[in-house]
Amino acid sequence: MDIRLDEGFLFGMGAFETIAVEKGKPILLEKHIERLEKAADFLQLGSCSARGFSKEKVFSYLASQDSEMTDHGVLKIVCSAENLFFQMRTNTYSEEDYAKGFVADISKVRRNETSSLVYHKTLNYGDCILEKRAAMAAGINEKVFVNTKGQISEGTVSNIFFVRKNMIYTPQLSCGLLPGILREYVMSKFSVVETIIYPDELMYYEECFVTNSLMGVMPVRQLGNICFPHRTRAEEVRTIYESEKMSL
């Protein structure tokens, strides 16, 4: 792989997508491509498609990979001013993770809702990586950011949802979060209220779950010192997504 040392490498001025691949199919590929192009435009990288990037290139790349990798894998697409490349790895989320449910904590790092970078999936990803590592070192699954106003925004690698009286709630975009592909899917299938949620309000919710393109829908059994013993709504959302994802 020939990678040029452009501003993507030097300053994080690049965009990327991570896409679940199941049985050789990249899930929600068109949505990911659309978001990648938006980020490339925001960062003034130039159009990805103008450089020859296409769905056909993605499928050609996947066809060249080992079938064990593409049966339950992760496709990463990275775009910077002078680079556009694919990378493949296995998807490590397991049924055991879903059965147990995630344990998360509130991060001490604040999400900057005033930064435009927060709303795009860019190579400026240091806060997320460091806090995800901190979560793993602490023996938990995820850290959840609050913004400079103390409002819950998102996880290090996930969007977050809460359930109260069977209604689904999620932080509104202005709280400083990536508009996730699975977040968009959930909001297209269910009635979801976008709102402002503070950590001291978590006791009023009965369920919590997080989403991203690789895990899909993951129940959360504990966030900080708040436990969520119920997962009825989360399981409903996950069941519908799992039944539809191969057609998305």
Language-model region placement:
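Short secondary-structure junctions
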Residues: 64-73
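A conserved short beta-strand within the histidine kinase catalytic ATPase domain
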Residues: 75-77
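Helix-start/capping segments and mature chain N-termini
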Residues: 1-60, 64, 80-248
